[in-house]
Amino acid sequence: MTKSTVLLLAALLAAPLAVQAATAPPANVKAAFGNTVLTIDPDGRSRKIWLKPDGTWTGLSRRGLDLAGKWSVKGDKVCLKQSKPRLLGSLCETFPTRPETGVEAQDPTGKTIRLKLVKGHVTH
């Protein structure tokens, strides 16, 4: 194997690691892995969302219907793109930095909601 072939192979093997390191989520997002993100509406009903380290998420709607999609980090916001049921676009919100207090946000209709992180995989 020539020196240039070895260097090319090393670069190809290292590239995915560099991309993964560059896109590592912040600590407040990592804290959601294995736990439940609640989006609480003014009427008290909530959606449950579970972020996974691989960039996907699953959840339950206010009515208990299955939700799923992909998530990404853009600046200080977490963006959810929903594929089940399919919705166009994505919703980006500031993610709670203090799980016990949560953060106020706006839903797509402009209604004020509260985002809160709850320990464990809460389903009810």
Spans of model-derived segments:
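Bacterial N-terminal signal peptides that target proteins for export
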Residues: M1-L8
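Lipid interaction determinants
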Residues: V6, L17-H124
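Hydrophobic alpha-helical transmembrane segments of integral membrane proteins
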Residues: L12-L13
